[in-house]
Protein backbone atom coordinates (compact mmCIF):
# COMPACT_ATOMS: atom_id res chain seq x y z
CA UNK A 1 0.00 0.00 0.00
CA UNK A 2 1.31 3.44 -0.99
CA UNK A 3 1.94 5.93 1.78
CA UNK A 4 -0.13 9.09 1.39
CA UNK A 5 1.93 12.24 0.84
CA UNK A 6 0.77 15.33 2.69
CA UNK A 7 2.08 18.72 1.61
CA UNK A 8 2.12 21.47 4.27
CA UNK A 9 -0.09 24.45 3.50
CA UNK A 10 0.93 28.07 2.92
CA UNK A 11 0.44 29.23 6.53
CA UNK A 12 2.45 26.31 7.94
CA UNK A 13 5.30 27.03 5.52
CA UNK A 14 5.29 30.76 6.38
CA UNK A 15 5.24 29.96 10.11
CA UNK A 16 8.12 27.53 9.68
CA UNK A 17 10.16 30.11 7.78
CA UNK A 18 9.46 32.78 10.40
CA UNK A 19 10.64 30.42 13.15
CA UNK A 20 13.79 29.55 11.22
CA UNK A 21 14.60 33.18 10.51
CA UNK A 22 14.11 34.05 14.18
CA UNK A 23 16.44 31.25 15.18
CA UNK A 24 19.03 32.24 12.58
CA UNK A 25 18.88 35.84 13.81
CA UNK A 26 19.41 34.62 17.37
CA UNK A 27 22.51 32.72 16.20
CA UNK A 28 23.78 35.24 13.65
CA UNK A 29 23.58 38.45 15.67
CA UNK A 30 26.29 37.57 18.22
CA UNK A 31 28.52 36.09 15.50
CA UNK A 32 27.98 39.11 13.29
CA UNK A 33 28.66 41.50 16.16
CA UNK A 34 31.86 39.66 17.06
CA UNK A 35 33.04 39.77 13.43
CA UNK A 36 31.94 43.39 13.04
CA UNK A 37 34.07 44.73 15.90
CA UNK A 38 37.07 42.52 15.14
CA UNK A 39 37.04 43.47 11.46
CA UNK A 40 36.46 47.10 12.43
CA UNK A 41 39.64 47.00 14.50
CA UNK A 42 41.54 45.09 11.80
CA UNK A 43 40.64 47.57 9.06
CA UNK A 44 40.62 50.84 10.99
CA UNK A 45 42.99 50.40 13.94
CA UNK A 46 45.09 53.34 12.70
CA UNK A 47 42.02 55.59 12.95
CA UNK A 48 41.09 54.33 16.42
CA UNK A 49 44.64 54.77 17.68
CA UNK A 50 44.84 58.29 16.25
CA UNK A 51 41.72 59.43 18.11
CA UNK A 52 42.58 57.43 21.26
CA UNK A 53 39.43 55.32 21.33
CA UNK A 54 39.06 52.64 23.99
CA UNK A 55 38.94 49.59 21.72
CA UNK A 56 37.43 47.49 24.51
CA UNK A 57 34.33 49.68 24.49
CA UNK A 58 32.21 48.67 21.50
CA UNK A 59 29.84 51.63 21.96
CA UNK A 60 32.76 54.04 21.74
CA UNK A 61 34.07 52.32 18.62
CA UNK A 62 30.66 52.31 16.98
CA UNK A 63 29.97 55.95 17.83
CA UNK A 64 33.36 56.98 16.46
CA UNK A 65 32.62 55.51 13.02
CA UNK A 66 29.37 57.47 12.92
CA UNK A 67 31.26 60.75 13.33
CA UNK A 68 32.31 63.48 10.93
CA UNK A 69 35.96 62.65 11.78
CA UNK A 70 35.52 59.12 10.45
CA UNK A 71 33.94 60.48 7.29
CA UNK A 72 36.99 62.72 6.84
CA UNK A 73 39.26 59.71 7.47
CA UNK A 74 37.45 57.79 4.68
CA UNK A 75 37.87 60.72 2.29
CA UNK A 76 41.66 60.56 2.84
CA UNK A 77 41.90 57.40 0.74
CA UNK A 78 40.40 54.85 3.11
CA UNK A 79 37.05 54.39 1.42
CA UNK A 80 38.17 51.17 -0.33
CA UNK A 81 38.90 49.65 3.09
CA UNK A 82 35.40 50.65 4.17
CA UNK A 83 33.84 48.97 1.13
CA UNK A 84 35.85 45.78 1.71
CA UNK A 85 34.90 45.85 5.41
CA UNK A 86 31.19 46.00 4.50
CA UNK A 87 31.54 43.22 1.91
CA UNK A 88 33.16 40.97 4.52
CA UNK A 89 30.43 41.71 7.08
CA UNK A 90 27.77 40.91 4.48
CA UNK A 91 29.60 37.70 3.49
CA UNK A 92 29.86 36.67 7.15
CA UNK A 93 26.11 37.05 7.61
CA UNK A 94 25.34 35.10 4.43
CA UNK A 95 27.78 32.36 5.49
CA UNK A 96 26.09 31.96 8.88
CA UNK A 97 22.63 31.82 7.31
CA UNK A 98 23.79 29.45 4.57
CA UNK A 99 25.51 27.20 7.11
CA UNK A 100 22.37 26.88 9.20
CA UNK A 101 20.06 25.98 6.34
CA UNK A 102 22.30 23.79 4.20
CA UNK A 103 23.78 21.92 7.18
CA UNK A 104 20.37 21.05 8.60
CA UNK A 105 18.92 20.24 5.19
CA UNK A 106 21.85 18.00 4.31
CA UNK A 107 22.21 16.11 7.60
CA UNK A 108 18.62 16.08 8.84
CA UNK A 109 16.54 16.69 5.68
CA UNK A 110 14.87 19.54 7.54
CA UNK A 111 15.48 22.60 9.70
CA UNK A 112 14.73 22.91 13.41
CA UNK A 113 11.37 24.56 12.80
CA UNK A 114 10.37 22.07 10.12
CA UNK A 115 11.47 19.25 12.43
CA UNK A 116 9.25 20.71 15.18
CA UNK A 117 6.35 20.95 12.71
CA UNK A 118 7.09 17.44 11.35
CA UNK A 119 8.06 18.47 7.84
CA UNK A 120 10.99 17.48 5.69
CA UNK A 121 12.51 18.41 2.34
CA UNK A 122 12.72 15.70 -0.31
CA UNK A 123 13.46 15.35 -4.01
CA UNK A 124 10.26 16.26 -5.88
CA UNK A 125 10.44 13.21 -8.18
CA UNK A 126 11.88 10.38 -6.08
CA UNK A 127 10.83 11.63 -2.63
CA UNK A 128 14.31 10.63 -1.46
CA UNK A 129 16.84 12.86 0.27
CA UNK A 130 17.82 15.76 -2.03
CA UNK A 131 21.37 16.03 -3.31
CA UNK A 132 23.76 18.67 -2.01
CA UNK A 133 23.50 20.37 -5.41
CA UNK A 134 19.71 20.60 -5.03
CA UNK A 135 20.07 22.02 -1.53
CA UNK A 136 22.54 24.68 -2.67
CA UNK A 137 20.20 25.59 -5.54
CA UNK A 138 17.34 25.78 -3.06
CA UNK A 139 19.28 28.13 -0.81
CA UNK A 140 20.38 30.37 -3.68
CA UNK A 141 16.82 30.41 -4.99
CA UNK A 142 15.65 31.79 -1.63
CA UNK A 143 16.33 35.18 -3.19
CA UNK A 144 12.93 34.69 -4.87
CA UNK A 145 11.26 34.12 -1.49
CA UNK A 146 9.25 37.35 -1.17
CA UNK A 147 7.40 36.57 -4.41
CA UNK A 148 8.16 32.87 -4.84
CA UNK A 149 6.44 31.83 -1.63
CA UNK A 150 3.08 32.66 -3.20
CA UNK A 151 3.63 29.84 -5.73
CA UNK A 152 2.56 27.54 -2.87
CA UNK A 153 -0.99 28.82 -3.25
CA UNK A 154 -1.20 27.66 -6.87
CA UNK A 155 0.81 24.43 -6.75
CA UNK A 156 -0.74 21.00 -6.22
CA UNK A 157 2.45 19.94 -4.39
CA UNK A 158 2.57 23.25 -2.47
CA UNK A 159 5.97 24.10 -3.97
CA UNK A 160 7.42 27.59 -3.59
CA UNK A 161 9.52 28.92 -6.45
CA UNK A 162 12.75 27.97 -4.66
CA UNK A 163 11.41 24.38 -4.40
CA UNK A 164 10.66 24.28 -8.12
CA UNK A 165 14.08 25.67 -9.04
CA UNK A 166 15.83 23.08 -6.85
CA UNK A 167 13.54 20.17 -7.74
CA UNK A 168 12.49 19.70 -4.12
CA UNK A 169 9.23 19.55 -2.22
CA UNK A 170 8.34 19.88 1.46
CA UNK A 171 6.22 17.07 2.87
CA UNK A 172 4.79 16.13 6.25
CA UNK A 173 6.89 13.40 7.85
UniProtKB/Swiss-Prot annotation:
Keywords: Cell membrane, Membrane, Transmembrane, Transmembrane helix. InterPro entries: Pra-immunoreactive (IPR051791), RDD (IPR010432). It is found in: Cell membrane. Its main location: membrane. GO terms for cellular component: plasma membrane. It is a multi-pass membrane protein. The keyword Transmembrane applies. The chain crosses the membrane at residues 24-44, 82-102, 135-155. Pfam families: RDD. PANTHER family: MEMBRANE PROTEIN, PROLINE-RICH ANTIGEN HOMOLOG-RELATED. This is Uncharacterized protein RP437.
Amino acid sequence: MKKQIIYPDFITRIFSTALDLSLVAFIAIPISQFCFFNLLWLFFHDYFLSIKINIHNSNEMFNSIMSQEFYEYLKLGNFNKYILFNILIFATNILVICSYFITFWYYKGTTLSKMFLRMKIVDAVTLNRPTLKQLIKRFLAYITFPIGIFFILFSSKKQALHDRIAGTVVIKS
